Each structure stands twice: as C-alpha cells, then as structure tokens.
Amino acid sequence: MSDKLLTIDLSHVYGFDKEIIFKKYQKKVDQIHQDFLAHKLADGHMTGWYDQPDQNHQFLLKTINQIDKKFKSLKVTDIVYVGIGGSFTGIKTVLDFLKPKQRTGLKIHFVPDLSAFQAASVIKEIKNKSWALITTSKSGRTLEPALNFRIFRNLLNKRYGNKHYQRVVVITDEKKGLLTKMASNHGYQKLVIDSNIGGRFSTLSPAGLLLAKLFGHDPKAILKGTLQAKKDLQTTSLENNSAYLYAVVRHWLYTTKKFKIEVCIAYHSLYEYLLLQHRQLFGESEGKNDKSLFPTFSIFTVDLHSMGQLYQEGEKVFFETVIDVKNPLVNINLPPSDFDNDDELDFLLDKSLNEISDVAIDSVIKAHYQANVSIIKLTLKEQSAFMFGYFYFWLSVATVMSGSLLGHNVFNQPGVEVYKKLMFEKLRSGH
C-alpha cells in the first residue's frame, strides 16, 4: 500500500486491540470483498465507479478538451451548474479541494435546490455575461434540477436564440431519460454517466472531470489518483488495506463501543464539501433499517469556538475522524508587526499559518483524547488533483465495506423516494 499517500492512525481509539479486531473481522472482510468483485452484493451491478480507473478514457478526455476549447472560443466567463445530491456535492468538493490552483477568468454558479433567492441571485449575476449551462441528471426527472434547468435554459435561449445549443452540456444516461431526448432534439453536447454508477459514487464521472478541466485542473491526474488507489486497495488484508481498516473500526465503534455519531473533522474551510461528501457517502449508503452511524462534521478551528465545549465535556456519544491534508497549496508566514508588537504575537514571528494549524490539530486531538473521545486520524499526503482522485476512490471503497458489514444494500436509497412520491402527489393534485 502507498503509505505515503494516505495513512490511518488509530493510536487515539480507546480499547482498540489490533490483534483482536483483525481476528474478529478478517474473514468477514474477505467474504464481502469477494462478493463485491463477483457482483453478489445487493444491486451488485452498480460498480461502474470501481471499474472506471482501468478503463480507456481517451475519448472522454478528448471530448472534455473540445468543450473547454469551445467555451474559451465563445469567451464564456460564467458557468451555471445545475445538479443535486452527489451531482452537486461531488462537483463542489473537487473544485473546492483544488481551488488554490483554479484558473482565473471563469466563475461557477451553483443552482442546487428550490431556493428562489439563489436562482434570482444567479440570474442577476450572469446578466450581460457570456455564460454556459451544464446540468447533471441521469433521469432528467429529478424535480429540483429539472425546474432549474428549465429556468436557465429559457434564459439562455432568450439570450442566444438558435445558437444557445453551443452553450449547453448535459451529463446523463447513455440511452434513457429526458435529457438524452433534449440533447438529440436540440443538438446539446452530451456526456454519459454509465447506468451502473450511482449519484454519490459519480464524482469522478464526466461531470467532475469536465468541471475540473474547465477550471484549470488536470483530469488525467485525478484519474491517475483513482488508479493508484485501486492498486493499493486490491488486498483484503486489514494490515495493508486502510480503507477496509477504516470501515472495520467504524463498525466496531458503532456495534461494540455503542457510539451513535461520527464527527468528521477538517481544519480548513476549503474542505467543508469534502466532509459533506463523506457524510453523503456513508449517510446514504448506511442509513437503513434503523441501523447506522449518524455522520456529521465540523470545521476546526472555527467550530471549536461554538461546539468545542460539547466535544470536550459533553456526553460522549460520538467518535471523531480527523482528515489532515498535508502540503497545502497556499501558505503565509506571520510578518513582523508594523505596530511595535502591540498584538504581542512576536513569539510566533516567521511561523506559517500552516505550522500553527498543525500545532492546533495535535493539541485538539490530545485534549479530546484526554476527555475520553476516540479519534481516527486520516492523513493525506498533499493537496493535489492526484490526491483528490485517490481519496475519493478510497472513501468509496470504505463506504462499500462499512455498509456491507452492517448488512445493508450500499447502492440504493429507497428512503429518498418517500418524500419525492408525496411531493409529486401534492403538486399534481394542486395540493
């Protein structure tokens, strides 16, 4: 395994005995792994994301490059992106994770929900701008993106008339769905999400790769990261497969130690959507049959000044997973004071914000551990396109193992359909 890319530290997990845990779980992990590869898990055909790293991506990358060149030739300055669920969270995650290297001269506007204020704000911002519209939906029938796509497609048509098709990209199923029909009827550029890839596992489908390219990042590097992760995670050995080990420890903390909540923590606001992606992967895959951890998150050190008291001295119904990204793309050293050290910070002179943040991470872990909080620490080698691809694939693999240990179908989300059914019934009846 590439230990230098991602390491898992369990030294702050109370009661963890490697020998006992490995003996208890190894055979279960071996069986689930075999069933996963043999497509024997429930909805076991939904493994397109796992097959993706080994596939030939030349045609997709060529098409993405062509779209990028076309938008540049049209002098597009603004992208309106319409999507929800994994089709939104994943895109926001990759762009935020790599934001320090984002190209200038292009702005993205997300329209992910039913907020009239958000839609109106975007409409106001893109007025008189050269803009394009991208949407992701396999069926084309999910209400929130369908409504927003209508609103913004109409605006695009009013602005550009019979040439509006040049500025539309739909990312959808190869053969089925309303967006496929629209693309055929109006000449929209279409990228395909394979039918065996679910939304929360689709970040590195054409949607994520296209947006990464448009904003100056390297899709090839992202894909190389996924391929390396897949190579590293071929083994079922808990000694060498950190994704499976993470899944096992989560399961043990939930079933044996009786924790109900996992608080996933990062130390930079840029990683908020990375934590949201963690929440969706585990929450949507495991939240079934009244048997699951409740995944939530905090951004430190900001949340230490609101939730820190609870984490330190509140009831210990939770454990923490800390994601520490090393070698960030941006750093600042504390400069000498122009005001004769009246802020009394000269003892930190020439230290960087990242160095100080590292001290904060170590100090918080020590403080929380002393307060009987169990803490899993995941350390990522760097902030890069390659590392993002690696970690997203790693999380997806961990999700499958973790949910399968609970006996769940990790690829469906039947509970989401309940509100949709009720909502459509009310809307169609005039409520």
Swiss-Prot record:
Q: Which family does it belong to?
A: Belongs to the GPI family.
Q: Which Gene3D superfamilies match?
A: Glucose-6-phosphate isomerase like protein, domain 1
Q: Which HAMAP family match?
A: G6P_isomerase
Record the organism. Mycoplasma genitalium (strain ATCC 33530 / DSM 19775 / NCTC 10195 / G37)
Which PANTHER family does this one have?
Answer: GLUCOSE-6-PHOSPHATE ISOMERASE
Which EC class is the enzyme in?
Answer: isomerase
Q: What is this protein called?
A: Glucose-6-phosphate isomerase
Q: Where in the cell is it found?
A: Cytoplasm
Q: What does this protein do?
A: Catalyzes the reversible isomerization of glucose-6-phosphate to fructose-6-phosphate.
